[in-house]
A protein has these predicted regions:
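Short acidic, glycine/serine/threonine-rich loops at helix termini
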Residues: 21-23, 73-78, 111-117, 123-125, ...
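Short beta-strand-loop/turn "lid" adjacent to the catalytic site in phosphate-handling enzymes
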Residues: 30-36, 54-85, 112, 118-121
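Internal, active-site/partner-interface "lid" segment
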Residues: 147-179
């Protein structure tokens, strides 16, 4: 392994921590995701997991870049970069033809437009309330006693998605509870939540 240069990226979000290791800046050799974000053991867990998965030690990592909500708090990082810039660079690296990125995070939602050379040409962001964020979906999954990862499979089975008219998480929560008491099919309810 000594003939390669390894770099590590860590995204420390509000609800999850993700890592990736690149070999010579081109090949993904390992990645990890831990469902715990900034202010928890999540970043260290993701970091240690990705090193273990790659069969590497911290000393073999030439450079570590941090991004995300907790990017300024991670001591193992050599540098930090905004999520917007990292999204642009990462998507352009993986899918150079892609021009639109949609990021539904735990605290905010972003839509990013890329130019043909991979630079950000424009973006919009909602960080004022939970509507349209991962937190909204997390709250709805909790009401339904589902894991957030199960929402997609339930929504895909829906034949008649119900209407959730509230975009506010608090009001949508009341609406979902009401739909449950009316025995609305779970798949139709989840599809309605995902479409709201």
């Amino acid at each position: 392994q000594g003939k390669y240069m390894y770099t590590l990226g860590i995204d420390i979000g509000s609800t999850t921590s993700k890592c990736v290791i690149l070999e010579d800046g081109r090949t993904i050799v390992a990645k990890s995701l831990v469902k715990a974000g900034t202010g928890t053991s999540g970043p260290d867990g993701a970091y240690n997991e990705v090193l273990h998965s790659a069969g590497l030690t911290q000393d073999e990592i030439a450079f570590t870049m941090a991004t995300g909500y907790g990017r300024k708090t991670y001591p193992a990082a050599d540098a930090e970069m905004s999520e917007l810039s990292c999204h642009g660079k990462g998507v352009f690296f993986m899918e150079p033809e892609c021009r639109t990125i949609i990021d539904i995070g735990g605290q905010d939602a972003k839509v990013i437009l890329l130019s043909s050379n991979g630079t950000i040409s424009n973006f919009v962001m909602n960080d004022k309330c939970a509507a349209g964020t991962g937190r909204f979906l997390d709250v709805m999954a909790g009401i339904l006693q589902l894991d957030i990862s199960e929402l997609e499979q339930y929504a895909a089975k829906s034949e008649h998605p119900c209407s959730i008219s509230s975009t506010c998480t608090v009001f949508a929560e009341s609406e979902v509870i009401s739909q449950l008491s009316n025995n609305v099919d779970l798949s139709d309810l989840v599809a309605g939540i995902c479409s709201s």
